Amino acid sequence: MSGNSIGKLFSVTSFGESHGPAIGCIVDGCPPGLTLSVEDIQQELDRRKPGTSRHVTQRREADRVEILSGVFENTTTGTPIALLIRNEDQRSKDYSKIMDVFRPGHADYTYWQKYGIRDYRGGGRSSARETAVRVAAGAIARKWLQQRYGIVIRGYMAQLGSIAIPFKSWDVVNQNPFFVADNDYVQKLETFMDSLRKSGNSAGARINVVAEGVPVGWGEPVYDRLDADIAYAMMSINAVKGVEIGAGFNSITQKGTEHSDEITPEGFLSNNAGGILGGISSGQPVVVSVAIKPTSSIRLARRSIDKAGNPVLVETHGRHDPCVGIRATPIVEAMLAIVLMDHALRHRAQNADVVCSTPRIPGSTTNQIHPVEMQASAPRAEDPEPDESS
């Protein structure tokens, strides 16, 4: 199997399966001299780990990270950093009934057709268990970006099922199990999830993530655009089915006078572009949104086939997240950090000596992390009526 790595100068290669002895990754390209401890990584893993509330899988994994190489006396050496997380609470017997059938919505059928063999225990390599090591690698990137450039990466759940959650404050995001930015919605979400769990069904979610402090100039047109690499990274996360940058699909209904972010000496008036123009960071906050599908592992019977092609009904038992989006915020943050660090190093390698005579305008103003809200508040010229004769 190929395709287990991401990044060019800052690269992450993951390995391991859901019910194997361990999962891990090799982080290559981290510059030397970064102060890094187990605690720096563990605090991010603890935000993602399972069993933290009744609304997520009850698989009990401590997700204790081990640093095997690349760090000496709590300082990165510039050599590959090997990270390991041991699996401690597998229940492979829960999956014995599906070893010869294909679960609808899962990678069972496609893995079997491609490789002629599959690890059916917990999804094997296709399990979201693999995302733990992404969070571990992302913790390294986050710390380097923060120390080197002052970049802050934060995410929150913006929608759970049909419930849209408004943004109220970053301060409350880590104070509730849903990573929502409005604590007034927590009880409503609790009730929704309790009902969902009892029904045996699942739900999707929308996660927004913002990187503030990203300098102007990062991104490698044409095929390695910053937004293209971000979308690539986000789509590699299990269950992600859509990615938006800035205004995203709302751009369809906007007019040019509304979507194009006007520029003044004091800064941009809006951020519909999501902080990226022509594939290059503009100095504004980088704004990304991802859509996460409902969990495919549900207790309700679904039609499928077995290995012989015979029709069967599949009921998935075991410990599963009724909404994988609940634990997805740290994962989405991590993938954005990995992409940004890779592009930071690439920009530094090729363009560090570039001097531009045009002053860099301020990149961050009020509400630019919420482009839709900014559209309503930004001063704009009146849109002309369309010319019916044209």
Curated annotation (Swiss-Prot):
Gene Ontology CC, one term: cytosol
Record text on cofactor binding: Reduced FMN (FMNH(2)).
UniProt xrefs under InterPro entries: Chorismate_synth, Chorismate_synth_AroC_sf, Chorismate_synthase_CS
Top EC category: lyase
PROSITE patterns associated with the record: CHORISMATE_SYNTHASE_1, CHORISMATE_SYNTHASE_2, CHORISMATE_SYNTHASE_3
Pathway: Metabolic intermediate biosynthesis; chorismate biosynthesis; chorismate from D-erythrose 4-phosphate and phosphoenolpyruvate: step 7/7
Gene3D superfamilies according to UniProt: Chorismate synthase AroC (3.60.150.10)
Catalytic activity: 5-O-(1-carboxyvinyl)-3-phosphoshikimate = chorismate + phosphate
Chain segments carrying region Disordered: 359-390
One GO BP: chorismate biosynthetic process
Required co-factors: FMNH2
The protein's Enzyme Commission number: 4.2.3.5
Pfam families (alphabetical): Chorismate_synt
Binding site for FMN: 125-127, 238-239, 278, 293-297, 319
Family: Belongs to the chorismate synthase family.
Record function comment: This reaction introduces a second double bond into the aromatic ring system.
Cross-referenced PANTHER family: CHORISMATE SYNTHASE (PTHR21085:SF0)
SUBUNIT field: Homotetramer.
Record's protein name: Chorismate synthase
